[in-house]
Each structure stands twice: as C-alpha cells, then as structure tokens.
Amino acid sequence: MNPLPTIKKKLKLLLNRFSVSYVKIDLMSVTQNELLKGRYAIITGGTSGIGYAIAEAFVKSGCNVIITGRSKGRLDNAVSKLSRYNTKTVGFVLDNTNVASFGLVFTQMQDAVNGQPIDILVNNAGVNFKGMPYTTEEEYDSVLDTNLKGTFFLSQVFGKYMVDNGIKGNILNVASASSLRPANSAYTLSKWGIRGLTLGLAKALAKDGITVNGIAPGPTATPMLMK
C-alpha cells in the first residue's frame, strides 16, 4: 500500500491549522573583496600572528583597518605590507595595559579615518608566560592586564562609542581553546575571563544591534607560541 496519499492528507490538515506567510528573498552574489567593503575595523595586536592574519583577511575583503601594537617598527612593517590592498590601513602604538591612554588613542583613531564610523573591534592582543608553579607575580599581572583587563576596557570604550552614535556593528574577542579546559596558568585564566566577558557583552549589547562573538583557536604557529 502506498503511504504517500495518507501522508499528504495529514500534512494538508496540519498546515490548514496554521497561517502561512510567504517571504520573497532576493539573493545576490558578493565577491570576496566586497564582504566587508566600506567598513572600518580596529584589530589589537595586529602586527603578527593571528592578529595580522585577521587584518590581512579583512583588507582582502574590502575592510579598512586600524591595527595596534607595542612596537612602532613592527607596526610600520605590518602597515606597509597591508597597504598593498586597495583599502585604508593605519597603525597606532597601544599598550593594552595602559588603560588611561585608551580614550585619547581612540579619539586619534577616529581622526585618522576622518570621522567615518568604526564598526568592528577585534580584541586580539595577548601575551603568555610560564604556567604554574613557575609564574612570577609580575608575569601574572602582565598577562591578566594585557589579555583580560585591556579587552574589558577597550570593549567598554568601543561599546559606548557605538551605542552613543547608533552604530550597529561587531566585537570579536579572541580567546583560546585552553579557555575550555581547567586553568593552571595566568594565560588560561585570562582566556576564561574573555570567554565570560564575551557572553556578558553579547547579552548586554544585543539590544543596540551590536553582535559580540568569540573564537577559541587551538595551538597556532604564531611567534608567541614559538617562543
């Protein structure tokens, strides 16, 4: 016996119980170099490793980028390489532990892009040292201040700027696969904090049209890992 007629009859009865609306969607093709066309992004720790790779992917997608780093020489080198793409690329010396400087540097960033809305923040800057039982207090403070404290206060400055100006955009926090495991180092502890912060920011800023995401890369052949 063919069950299809019975199935169709039951489906028809089921659908008749609900109102059905039809939505027309126009699909369009977007080329790779236009995915982020016209957008402006800040990428911390953008001179090497994952940060530089993100910056390069962004400029290839048409995004204008502002990268930060602690070394002027490495910043200039990264900006020079990224400038071969047809987007605006600028660099700013920024120490993630110097929270007092964030407001002034962010104002300078806005001036550098002629007041264009900056609608993406990538919190990538980070440092790492030895884990327990070899961590010094100085190393602990450096890791937590750079990785977590810096991310917290940059997100606060940037989030307020977006909300105050009605800018809908994105914050991306770079955590680590280690944030999914028990913490036995300052680095892993900082990434646990970033994961929790990401969840909190996502909930707090969603109503303002700001999407907050986190990524948790595993071991990656970056200069920091190879030390």
Language-model regions, residue ranges each:
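Non-catalytic terminal and boundary segments that flank Rossmann-like NAD(P)-dependent oxidoreductase
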Residues: 1-40
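Conserved glycine-rich cofactor-binding loop
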Residues: 40, 47-48
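Conserved NAD(P)H cofactor-binding loop of Rossmann-fold oxidoreductase domains
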Residues: 124-129
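Substrate-binding pocket helix/loop in short-chain dehydrogenase/reductase
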Residues: 131-144
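Active-site helix of classical SDR
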Residues: 155, 190, 198
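Alpha-helical segment proximal to the catalytic Tyr-Lys
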Residues: 160, 164, 203-207
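Residue(s) in the substrate-gating loop at a strand-loop-helix junction
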Residues: 176
